[in-house]
Amino acid sequence: MMIDKLYKRVEKNGHVCAGLDTSLDYIPEYFKTKYFNEEDIIFNFNKEIIDATYDKVACFKIQIAYYEALGLKGLRAYKRTLDYIKESDGIVISDIKRGDISSTAKMYARAHFEGDFETDFITLSPYMGLDSIEPYFEYMKQKGKGVFVLVRTSNEGAKDIEFIESKDGNKVYEIIGKKLKNMGQDFLGNCGYSSIGGVVGCTHIDEAVKLRKDLGGMFFLIPGYGAQGGKAEDVALYLKNGNGGVVNSSRGILLAYKKQNDEKNFAKCSRNEVIRMRDDILQAINSK
C-alpha cells in the first residue's frame, strides 16, 4: 500500500512534502532562455528541484491547476513530471481536489489512478457526500492508491463552511473527519494509518490536539506551514510519535533562491530550504 511506503519515507527522510505548484513567474529568467517552449521550461525546472531534494523529502505534491492553466503544453509538463518522479521511485500526491457524483467520480478515478496521469495519491473534496469518494475504493484495494480528503483546511475562508455547527454542536469538519476515519478502517496499512487521509492545515493550533486524538488512524497532509503562518511547533501537534503526516511547502521551496539571493543555484537553494524545514520540524517534535 502506498500509505505504508509514505510512512516509511517519512521515517527515512523527514516530513517535508515539496510542492511543485510551478508558475512560469517563479522560474529565473536565465533558465527560461535555455528552452524553446513552456512545456520544456516547466518540466526541466521541476526536474532540477526533484533531483536536488529527492533524498530529503517524503514526497512531492503537484497542484494540477498550475498545469491546466497552460493547456496541453502544461498537461504534458505535468505528465512528464509525474513520470520522472515515479521513475525515481518517488511518491506523488496529485492535488486535484475533485468532488462529484459517483458516475463522474469513477471517471476521475480512472483518469488519475491509471493511464497517462497515474499518480499515487489524490486530493478530494467531500462536500457532495461520501458516495463521491467510494468510486476510488477499487483502486485503493487493487493498486494500493490513497486519497487525502479535505477536512480542516488552512485558508481563512474555511470557516464559512467547515465551522458550521450541527444541532449536537459538532462542526462540519469534525463530522467529516469522523466519518472518514470510520470509512478508513477498511483500508488500514501495516503502519496503522489508513489510505484515506485528511487535509488538515496547521494554522489552527487550538484544534490540533483534539483533531489528532479524534482521528488517530488518519494520515494528514498538512498545508499552511511558512507562507500561511504555520510554524514547526504547530505542525508537531498534528503528528503522532513523530509520524502520521507530511507538511507541504510550495512557494517556500520553489522560491528559496530569492530569499537566498542566488538564482543561478536555485535548485541548491531549494534543497537548503527543505533541509532547514525538515530540521525545524524534527526539532519541534523532539521538544514537544
UniProtKB/Swiss-Prot annotation:
Residues at the catalytic site: K97
Gene: pyrF
Pathway the protein acts in: Pyrimidine metabolism; UMP biosynthesis via de novo pathway; UMP from orotate: step 2/2
Claim: Lipid biosynthesis is one of the keywords in the record: no
Superkingdom classification of source: Bacteria
Reactions it catalyzes: orotidine 5'-phosphate + H(+) = UMP + CO2
Name of the protein this chain belongs to: Orotidine 5'-phosphate decarboxylase
EC numbers on record: 4.1.1.23
GO molecular function annotations of the record: orotidine-5'-phosphate decarboxylase activity
Family: Belongs to the OMP decarboxylase family. Type 2 subfamily.
Organism: Clostridium tetani (strain Massachusetts / E88)
